[in-house]
Amino acid sequence: ITGLDGKYYLMFALDMEGSCRLGLASTSDFATFKFLGIVSGEDNRNGVLFPEKINGKYLRMDRPNRVQKEGGPLSSSSIWLSESDDLIEWRGRSALIEGRFHYWDEFIGSGPPPVKTHEGWLHIYHGVATHFQSSNIYQAGVMLLGLDDPSRVIGRCRGNILEPRE
């Protein structure tokens, strides 16, 4: 859920037959919602909007699903950045960060909307370690993106900031 332009926008995964797309809805009161449409043209999930326009464009991070592990769902190991004039049609997609093989964040995806700080956009993302004998362990990490150019990764935590212990 992202507050933007006086409304709240919800970007969500639409599980469809054989694939997953990103859907977008808006609300101003959380009692009624308006479905705005399907906003991804390919198998995709973990979409999150930036809470303000940057250089006159709406920005979103998402995770195209391109990898299928044996017996598992289609997933991916990268977070992408794209831009839009209207929140519906998206273009200019490019990889922002990649998962790290045999590390806590082999498969990754965005978390909540990024937070604007004086140093840049702080973004929490999730990672999945898949190399623990088929026991997927979800963890959280953090990265900092350029304030005026979020395609620039200023820093990314080497270790996780949150993980389950039991």
What residue ranges belong to the model's regions?
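Beta-rich carbohydrate-recognition and catalytic domains
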Residues: 2-48, 52-106, 115-166
